[in-house]
Amino acid sequence: MLIGYILGDGTLKIKVLKGFKDILPGEVELWQQVEKITRDIFTRHNFSEIRMPILEQTDLFARSIGEATDIVEKEMYTFVDKKVTMRPEATASLIRAYIENGLYVAKPVQRLFTIGPMFRHERPQKGRLRQFHQMDIEVLGSVNPLVDAELMAMGSMVFRTLGINVRLEMNSLGCPECRPVYRQALVEFIEDRFEHLCDDCKRRSKTNPLRVLDCKNAGCRAQVEEAPSILDYLCGDCADHFDTVCTTLESLEIPYSLNKFMVRGLDYYCRTTFEFITDDLGAQSAVGAGGRYDGLVEKLGGPVGMPGIGFAIGMERLILLLQQKETEFVAEKLDLFVIGLGDAATKLACILSQDLRGLGVGVAVDYEGRSLKAQMKLANKAGVAATLILGENEIETGKAVLKNMDSQEQCEVALVAGDIFAALAMSAQ
């Protein structure tokens, strides 16, 4: 069924789907600059980019995220007959690619990142859409707690570079050795308060009791305020691991706070979990989050005991924060606007511009037969560095005037791409 409405003249106006958004010129430049800045930070930290398909087997997410999670139970876009799903997050897809392509053979420790769209059938709200974009960063093959601290330091660098105020909150979820002991203590605590919990938490208390700590319902939050902390139940190895993470962050002078309620919404997390929180979007919001998942690679068919850790940054919330700050990134200007006056001159403009683009010059040409005045307005609006005007006289002489739009200085140049390129370089000095 088409999503839209009928206009007065009987034509159908098709609209974007609820929870989806067009990113238009004027805004997309901000996205491009953010991606450019973050890619630079990731590559400086020795991460390589990987790109995976959007569509994956449903079982991949059921096995990794957890069948009892809200994402798998309520939020995935699944083609039930084909048993395939539009990815709701990137970690599982990245690990599938890591295993399937044997990346662990070529390099024992893989440092990977990906940027792209994810899909969840949630209630659309500020900074949360049904198609949303994430930057996902993963380290596979290292259990060293210094890697945990390095990832959080890199995340802090991203937000600091973009001028976004965040605070870092952390917790540890222990391991298969110590978490069951804590789980039992939490279940006993919840049982005494069961009747005061929301329906979702009553269900979670049976299937995944740690998620009760993560409930946003004010009544539930009040009930679990005095819940035991998992940090008091960590085994020796997990306690040492978390202590190293904390002391390393202190050495790096990265502020953090402990949050015993942080359990994350995905079942695969263990040990270190963390979130970057901002208060600048109204309600408290996480703009980046992640943690360690030392059993996930093996669970999905990868090498036994292969550890991993990663985090994701939500692009939509990042962009909202930058727009609220009225942050402006200057888009790269075109180098040249070639103005053609008449059919023959416009054809020559087309040929010259293509030759110049081959030399790395950004060129704009108007093909609509506008006047000189109108094309000069277009050139000014485009913010080009220079203009080149072609008419009958220029075609006859094989020369034209190149004008610097900032200094208004002019020079005569032969209508040869190499000569124009050299003149542009001189004009820019």
UniProtKB/Swiss-Prot annotation:
Top EC class, one word: ligase
Pfam families in alphabetical order: HGTP_anticodon, tRNA-synt_His
EC number in record: 6.1.1.21
Reactions catalysed according to its record: tRNA(His) + L-histidine + ATP = L-histidyl-tRNA(His) + AMP + diphosphate + H(+)
Compartmental location: Cytoplasm
GO biological process, one term: histidyl-tRNA aminoacylation
Broad class of the protein's primary localization: cytoplasm
Family: Belongs to the class-II aminoacyl-tRNA synthetase family.
PANTHER family per UniProt: HISTIDINE--TRNA LIGASE, MITOCHONDRIAL-RELATED, HISTIDYL-TRNA SYNTHETASE
UniProt name for this protein: Histidine--tRNA ligase
Organism: Desulfotalea psychrophila (strain LSv54 / DSM 12343)
Gene assigned in the entry: hisS
